[in-house]
Swiss-Prot record:
It comes from Berne virus. It is a single-pass type I membrane protein. GO terms for biological process: membrane fusion involved in viral entry into host cell; symbiont entry into host cell; virion attachment to host cell. It is found in: Virion membrane. The keyword Transcription does not apply. InterPro entries: S_torovirinae. This is Spike glycoprotein. Residues 1-20 form the signal peptide. It comes from the Viruses. One of its GO terms (cellular component) is viral envelope. Glycans are attached at residues 25, 384, 494, 574, 935, 969, 1267, 1297, 1385, 1389, 1428, 1431, 1438, 1483, 1487, 1495, 1515.
Amino acid sequence: MFLCFCAATVLCFWINSGGADVVPNGTLIFSEPVPYPFSLDVLRSFSQHVVLRNKRAVTTISWSYSYQITTSSLSVNSWYVTFTAPLGWNYYTGQSFGTVLNQNAMMRASQSTFTYDVISYVGQRPNLDCQVNSLVNGGLDGWYSTVRVDNCFNAPCHVGGRPGCSIGLPYMSNGVCTRVLSTTQSPGLQYEIYSGQQFAVYQITPYTQYTITMPSGILGYCQQTPLYVDCGTWTPFRVHSYGCDKVTQNCKYTLTSNWVVAFQNKATAVILPSELIVPVAQKVTRRLGVNTPDYFWLVKQAYHYLSQANLSPNYALFSALCNSLYQQSATLSTLCFGSPFFVAQECYNNALYLPDAVFTTLFSTLFSWDYQINYPLNQVLTQNETFLQLPATNYQGQTLSQGRMLNLFKDAIVFLDFFDTKFYRTNDAPSSDIFVVVARQAQLIRYGNFRIEQINGYFQVKCSSNIISTLEPHPAGVIMIARHHSMWSVAARNSTSFYCVTHSLTTFGKLDISTSWFFHTLALPSGPVSQVSMPLLSTAAVGVYMHPMIEHWIPLLTLAQSQYQPSFFNIGINKTITLTTQLQAYAQVYTAWFLSVIYVRLPEARRLTLGVQLVPFIQALLSIKQADLDATDVDSVARYNVLSLMWGRKYAVVNYNQLPEWTYPLFKGEIGESMWFRKKIMPTTEGCQTSAHFSSITGYLQFSDYVYIPKYNKVSCPISTLAPSVLQVYEVQSLFVILIQCVSGSYDWYPGLSGGTAFVYKSYKLGTVCVLLPSDVLSTGPNIGFYSGTALSIVTVQTTNDVLPNCIGLVQDNIFTPCHPSGCPVRNSYDNYIVCFDSSTYTFKNYHRTTPPVMNVPIQEVPLQMEIPTVILQSYELKHTESVLLQDIEGGIIVDHNTGSIWYPDGQAYDVSFYVSVIIRYAPPKLELPSTLANFTSCLDYICFGNYQCRTEAQTFCTSMDYFEQVFNKSLISLKTALQDLHYVLKLVLPETTLELTELTRRRRRAVYEFDDTISLLSESFERFMSPASQAYMANMLWWDDAFDGFSLPQRTGSILSRSPSLSSVSSWNSYTSRTPLISNVKTPKTTFNVKLSMPKLPKASTLSKIGSVLSSGLSIASLGLSIFSIVEDRRVTELTQQQIMALEDQITILTDYTEKNFKEIQSSLNTLGQQVQDFSQQVTMSLQQLSNGLEQITQQLDKSIYYVTATQQYATYMSSLINHLTELAAAVYKTQDMYVTCIHSLQSGVLSPNCITPSQIFQLYQVARNLSGQCQPIFSEREVSRFYSLPLVTDAMVHNDTYWFSWSIPITCSNIQGSVYKVQPGYIVNPTHPTSLQYDLPSHVVTSNAGALRFDDHYCDRYNQVYLCTKSAFDLQPSNYLTMLYSNISENVSLTFHPEPRPDPCVYLSSSALYCYYSDQCNQCVVAVGNCSNQTVTYRNYTYPIMDPQCRGFDQITISSPIDIGVDFTALPSRPPLPLHLSYVNVTFNVTIPHGLNWTDLVLDYSFKDKIYEISKNITDLHQQILQVSSWASGWFQRIRDFLYNLLPTWITWLTLGFSLFSIVISGINIILFFEMNGKVKKS
C-alpha cells in the first residue's frame, strides 16, 4: 500500500511501506484510503492555534483557525469537510512562495505506524514568518521573522544524553539540550536547525513522535544519526521536516509516523455522500436499538487522554482546541442551514451531530479533571494561578443533573480564550446559568461587542463601543461575569447589570452562527433520549435563544408557520428513527422555552405589544402530544409545565422521576452548606440590639441580584444544646418561608427582626419552627434573629372551602410546598398547615374542612345508554350546583377501605344504613420465567416499545397473558372432553358386567351413577365457564403458586400478541388436530394375553365418603351458580325466579354451614387421606413395574413387522402427549388446591389471608360498627352472606396488569350515631361551590378508587371508575336500569340525586404533592399520571389494560381523559360490570385427558388395529371405587397430591420411553377379560 501526494510542482511526499516510488506531479493518486480513523496524536496536532504575523505587523489573513498541518479537506470515515488554509510560506531568500496548503491538502491517520520518504528538490525550502510570545512558562524573547534553533553551538553529540540533535533553549556548552519550548508559545512554528552554513527547516508539532534519519552522504550536523526530540517536563515534542539542509541538491528523509499528509491539486466541494448514513464499521454506537456512526470518538478519546494527564494541560492548547471546534461547528452549521430549520436529512443525521457531541464531550471532560475549587486564599490570587480550575466530582450524580451542569457552563467557553482567567462554579446558585470568571491578569475580555478592559486599575465595561460602567476591582483582584440571556451582570467591588445585544439576525434561514455558537450548548436529557444528540437546537433554536429583540422573530415565525404546516416545526426528521416524535417534542419545548425566557426579560411595554403576536406561536410549539415528551427528562417536563401555565394552557404533563428544578427551594440542605439569598434581604449588623441565632454574615460576594453566602454555620436552636439538622428557605410571592428543625420538646420562639415585621410560629410538629419573612418589608436589610420569648400560636380554623384563595403554600412533614396561584387545597383532616396573606399580614394556620352531612333520600330511576369503556377514570364538569360523588357519602359517612374505620362529622346523630367495603388486593409474586420461555420476546417488545428497562418489569404481565391464553384455556377444554368421555365410558361399561351384585356393590353402583350425573353437570358448566371473565378468574386461582413450576407451556397461534411458537414450547397436543385413526393397516397375529398385577391398597371408604359429600354439594352449587351466571350474561332475563333464589339460598346455606362446622373434620380427613395416598403411590409404582414386565412379554410375542413398529412409535408418541397434558393439568390442579388449602387454614385460624375472606373476619369487621357509640346491627340475610362464601368473579374491568381486586360489601344498619368516632383521611374532596374544586391526594398505600358499594333504598350501588352505578336488583344488568349517582348541594335540603347527562370539561395542574383538576370553559383535556408510571396500555377484547411501572403497581396511577360525551355516548361504564353476587364455585374433579380427535370409545372398543384383538382386564367392582378415588384426588381438597404425582410421573415416563405399545391395567382379584373383535362385538371369557 502506498500513497502519493503532490502539490503542483512544489512539494511531494512519497509515502509507502518500504521504499520510494517516483510518480509524476499531478492530481492526487492513491491506491486506497487509509482505513483508520483519526488517531489521538493527529487530534492533538490539530488543536494548535497559530497567529500569523509579518514581522511585528499584524496582518489579516483569510483564515479562521488552523491545524498544525492545516487541511482544506478533512476526511473522517470518508466524510470530507473543507476548511480555509492558514499557512503562508516564503523562500529562504524572502521571496513569497505563496500558500502551501491552500485548498489542496487533506489528512489521514492510522493506528499503525508508517515509514515513508520525504523528498525535497533544489530551491524548495520555505521559511515561516511567525510570532513567538514571551510568556511566563518559557519561550523565546522578542519577535523573530525566522526562528533559528541551533544545536548547542554545533557541539558534538554527548554521552550524557540521548544521541542526536535536540531542539530548544537555552544554549548549553556541554551535554544534550533538554529544555524544550513550552506550548504556551503558539505552537506549530517553523524552526531552522543550523548545520554549518545551511539551515534545515523543521516544523515542530507537539504530540507527534517522529524519528528523522538523515542518510549518509548528506551534509548536516546529524548525519547518520537519528534526530530525536526530547520529552520536556510534561509535553512530548515532535518534529517534522519540510525541507532539506542542502540547497544545491535534492535530498530524501525517511520519516516514521502514525499520520500522513496528502496534497491534491484541486479542492473539491463539500458533498455529503450517501455513505454517511451507513454505520461505520470500526466505531458504532447503538442508540435506542439503532446502530449510529459515532463520528466523535476521536474527541472523546482525546479528552480522555487529557483527563489522564499527570499535570494540568496547557491552557493555550485547550483554548486552541475550543477555537477549532467552534469554527468546525460554524462551518458545518452553515453547510446544513440552507432552508429554515434544516429539512436536509443527511445534514441532520451527520454533520449537525458534530457541535453538540463535541461540546457535550468537552464539558463532560471538564468535570472529570481532578481540580478543586479554591476561593482566593487571603483574598489574593497566587502567582501561578493562570490555568483553568474546575471541580471534579461535586457536580456528578445527585448534586446536579447533567442538564443543570451543562447549562451552567454554556457561556463559560466565551472566556476560555484568555490565558489568565480562573473559572469558578457556585455551589447552590438559584439559577443554573450563573458562573463566575475571575479575571485578574487579562487586560481585555471581549465577546462580540461586549468588552471589559483594564484601564488604570479599573474595569471599563463597554457595549457596542459605549462605556456602560466603570467598576472598581474586588480586593481579591476579581471580577465576576454572568450572562442571563443577553443580560450581562458584572460584579467587582460594585456591581452592575445591563442589557447588551451581542448578536444579530442576518438573512432568513441563516443565522449568524459564528457569533452565537458558544451560547447554544444544551444539556442532553436524563431519560431514554440521553443517547440522542440534539442538533435541532444547534442551529434552529440557537437564534431564538440568542436574539433578545423578540420582534425580529415575528416575521420569521409567521413565514415558517405558513411554509411548514400542519406542524409548526416540521423538522424534516426521518420518521423511521426511534423516538423521532420525542426528539421533535424536545426541540419544540426548548424553542418555546427560549422565546419565553426572552419575552419575560423584556420591559412591560414591549411585552404587551409582542405578547399578543407571540402567543399563537408558543401554543403551536406546545401543540405536541404529551405522550411524545419524555417524562423521565425532568428538565423538559418542568419547562413544558411552566410554559403550559404561562401561555394559557392549563394542563401539564406531570410525570416526574424527581421533583423539577422549579419546585426546589432556594436552599435545602445541611447547615454549613452554601446558601443564596436575595440581596435585598441580606442580613446586616445594623440595628442589631442583641445576639441573634442568625448571626450576621460577612465576607460574602454580591453577585447580580443575589447575595451568595459561601458557608453559614451560625444557625442555632432556642435550646443551646441542640443543633438544627435542616434549614430550608423557600421564596414565594414576596415571602420567604424558613423551616428549621430542632428535635426537642415543645418550646416558643420570638422573632427578633429590626426594620420590619416577621412572623414566627411555634412548632407545628415536634421540633419544627416556621418563620415567615416578607421580603417587601425587609428591603432595609434587617438582621435575622430569633430570641427566646413568646411566639405566635398556630390557630385551628374550620372552613367549608376546598381551596383557600390568597394562600401561597402549605407545610406538611417538614416540607413546604408552594400552591397553585388560585389557592391552597384543604383536606378532611386537621393537618393542613397553610400560609396565607391578607394585605401585608401573613398567617400560618391549621385549616380543617367541614361539609354538611348527606342523608338517605329517595332515588328516582333515570335510564342511561352505555357503551364499552374507553377511559380509566371519568371526570365531570363541576357546576356551582353539583359535583361528582367521589367518596362514599361525602361529608356524611366516610369509610376507610383500608382499615374499616368509619367517621361521622359534626357530632350529629344519624340513622344510616351503609356498607363496609372489604377489598382484597391480590398481586401474585413476581414470576421467574423458565429457560424454555426466555425468548417470549414479541410480548415484551409489544409492551415496552424498545425500552429495555421496561422489559424486566413487563415479564409478569407477559407471563400472565400466557397463562391466561394458553395453559388454563386448553386445560379446561381437555378436562371438559375427558369428563364427557368418562361419562360415556361409565354408561358403556356398567351394563356389560355379569357379576352378581351384592348390596355393597349396588351402593357403589349408585355412587357411580351419581358421580356420572355430577360429571355431566360439570362438563356442561365448563362450556359456560369459558368466558373471558371466567378465564381471568381461574387464571388468578392458578397464579397463586410459582408460575409454570418448570413446565414448558404451549404457544397458541392467533393470540392478541401474534407470537410465533418457539421450538421449545410447542405442546404435543398440536400434533393431533384431526380425527384420524391412530394406527391403520397394521396386520398382526391374534393373541390373547393375561397379565396379572397386584392391587394397591386403596384409601378407606369413610375418608372418601366425607370428601365426596363436600364434592357433591359443591358441584351442585357450582352448576347452579354457573347457570345463573350464564343467564345473566346472556341478558335474556332481568330477574331470577323465586325458585332459583330459594334454591340458591338453600345451597349457600348448606355450603356455609358445612364449611363453618366441619372444616376441622375435613382437615383431619385430608391429612389421613394424604398418608393413604402416599402409601398408594408406592404400591402403584410396584404395579407399574409389574405392568412393564408384562408388556415386555407381550412385546416379545408380537409380530415385528414394519406396521407394528409404526404402531408402537405412534402410540408411544400419543402416550407422551397424554402425559404432557396430565403434567400441565396437574400443575393447574396444584395451584388451585393450594388456594383452597390456604382458605381452609384461614377459616381455621381466623387470620385474613391474601386470597380468602373468612366468616371470622366478617364478624371482626362487624365489631368496627359495634364499637360506635350508637346501635349498629349487621344485615345478615342469607343472600348477603352468600357474597362472602363465593369467590368473587373477576371481570375485565377489575383486572389490572398483575393485580386482582376482590371486593365485598358488608351491610350494616346503625342508629343514633354520635360524634366523630374514627377520623380518616378520605381520598377525594369535592366542593360544589368552587370552580376549581377537585383534588386528588396522592395515595400512600391501597387506593380506594375502585372499591366499595352503597345501598340507598332498594338500590345496590357499586363504584366503577369513580362513578356509582345503582340498580334495583343485584342481578339486574340491564343498562336502562342503571343510575349514575352524582352529589348535589342545591339547597339547604341536602340530597343525593342522579343526573343522566353530566358534561366533562376538566383541566389539570400539579403541585409537588397534590394533584388538581380545574374546570373552566378554556380547558378541554386532562391527562394526569401520578407517580413514576408509564402511560402504556394493551387492548384486549375491547378492554384497555394499563401496563404499569413497579413503583405504581396497583391503582397508584390516576388517569383522566376527556372530552367524553356522556349521554347517548356514555362511555364511563363497562358493558359487563361485576355482579354484586358472584357465584363461581368450581372444582376440578378429574385430571385425565386424551388427544384431540379421539375419545374413550376409540380407545376401549375400536383401537384401529384391524387384525389384532387387545385384552384389557378390569375388575369392574374395584373400578367403581377407583373412579371415585381419582375424582377426589383431582378435586384439589387434599394437601399431598404433589407427592403422589411426583412419585408417579417418573415411572410413567420411564416405561413410556421404552416404546411399549399397550396400556393395560390388570388388577388382582376376579379377572373379567373382555375380548374386542375388530367388528366391535364383545366376547366374554
